[in-house]
Amino acid sequence: MNKRHEFTPEEIERLNHDLKRQLGPEFLSQRTGPGGKFTYIEGQSAIHLANELFGFNGWTSELRSLTVDFMDEHDGRVDVGVSAIVRITLKDGTFHEDVGYGQMENSKSKGAAMEKAKKEAATDALKRALRMFGNVLGNCIYDKNYTSRMQYVKKPGVIITIQ
């Protein structure tokens, strides 16, 4: 985004309101991790929400760095860890950046391990940078009271209309 475009007062008011909202259960996923269940937002959901909030051309993401932290080969298998820094910039120049991490263990292929770890690190960094803008972009997931309440809320059914 080369030119800065200021948000209108109406856009600022709407964004301030919307960014304070919490994610609905349809945007949350869970997986088992250290210490039990882990709640997260998938990468495509975070991008979808950013497009809805800021407009498809109202924000950009930039991969600022991608670093292979380690690569170990043993018995024909590969373990790799990668860290990434992503910056999210809004049309008015406001930005946040954060670090993400990705890894692959016990892979048969060095290429497959690197691909998975790099994509995972970049997506993790993107989601972590987006969450800094507000609750509706994932920051609410860090509120343990919120995530414990969401375990008991059913996801709404999806209705697809084809015209």
Where are these regions (language model features)?
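Positively charged, aromatic-enriched nucleic acid-contacting surfaces
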Residues: 3-13, 46, 53-161
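N-terminal, Lys/Arg- and Ser/Thr-rich interaction peptides
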Residues: 1-47
